[in-house]
Regions:
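Mg2+-dependent prenyl diphosphate-binding active-site environment of isoprenoid biosynthetic enzymes
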Residues: 1-185
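Conserved small/polar residues in nucleotide/adenosyl-binding loops
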Residues: 189-193
Length: 193
């Protein structure tokens, strides 16, 4: 179980390092990002190094199903990040597309962690699917809360610049719900982008 947990943590950290480069984030959790301390190229290589280490740890589980799920999760997360980047400042996004996007990013990692834990621990098959769904729902909830905090908390509370999602053109659930309640204001939001 420990190699799986280490692989998930390394994968998560690698994605955060890459996210900070993409977002040009100066800090995370109140501390300078790797890109701020070094440079973008070194940060990308550090993230890649962590991806490779994560793959090494997941391989130590010796479970081909867990290894395949891990590889699929990496692909799904990369696709989610690409989708988010390609839809920046696209204010026509709807709530379902938002849910699809966060399912492909945060929720897929939580789902793989929960499912992989069940598999590696030898849980009966009837529990594996429910554990995956639990992880996915937990990941969705985590991302929604994170998006709400980006919209409502201060930079000091977040440890990073508040409102960074909106500034980078990432349309999150709070923005979608606001635009849904105030359709007349949608033209104003479109002009922001």
């Amino acid at each position: 179980l420990v190699p799986l947990a280490a692989s998930v943590e390394l994968l998560h950290t690698a994605t955060l390092i890459h996210d900070d480069v993409i977002d040009a984030a100066p800090e995370r959790r109140g501390r300078p990002t790797a890109a701020a301390l070094f440079n973008n190229a070194s940060s990308v290589m550090l993230g890649d190094y962590m991806f490779a280490h994560a793959a090494e740890f997941v391989a130590r589980t010796g479970n081909i199903r867990v290894i395949r799920n891990f590889a699929d999760t990496l692909r799904v997360m990369a696709n989610g990040e690409l989708t988010q980047d390609m839809s920046a400042f696209e204010y026509s996004e709807d709530v379902q597309r938002y849910f699809d996007r966060i399912a492909g990013k945060t929720a897929s990692l939580f789902a793989t962690a929960a499912e992989g834990g069940a598999i590696v621990c030898g849980a009966p098959e009837r529990y594996v699917g429910p554990m995956r769904r639990y992880g996915e729902q937990l990941g969705m909830a985590f991302q929604i809360v994170d998006d709400i905090l980006d919209f409502s908390a201060t930079s000091e509370e977040l440890g990073k610049p508040a409102g960074s999602d909106l500034l980078s053109g990432t349309v999150t659930l709070p923005a979608l719900l606001y635009m849904g309640r105030s359709p007349a204001d949608r033209s104003e939001e479109r002009r922001v982008g």
